[in-house]
Amino acid sequence: MANSKSAKKRALQSEKRRQHNASRSSMLRTYVKKVIAAINAGDHESATAAFVTAQPIVDRMATKGLIHKNKAARYKSRLNAKIKALAA
């Protein structure tokens, strides 16, 4: 338990950040799941549309430090490859 005033403040800030990051992480997973669901359904148009909306979200989370920039690149690359495979 935090004893000093500054430690209490840091504990409050930490909890606030944890909740905020959890919310953003959930949002990221939701957008990625929408793309994956469209890919699994075999619908190229809706998969592309979902990917276009998910792409800036993934980039933003990488910028905010929620995920590593290489992980963001990996997400985008793999999803895009699956979408291209649908078109072929």
UniProtKB/Swiss-Prot annotation:
GO cellular-component term (any): small ribosomal subunit
InterPro entries hit by this protein: Ribosomal_bS20, Ribosomal_bS20_sf
BP terms from Gene Ontology: translation
Cystine pairs: none
Its job: Binds directly to 16S ribosomal RNA.
Family affiliation: Belongs to the bacterial ribosomal protein bS20 family.
Official protein name in the record: Small ribosomal subunit protein bS20
Upper taxonomic lineage: Bacteria, Pseudomonadati, Pseudomonadota, Gammaproteobacteria, Alteromonadales
Annotated gene: rpsT
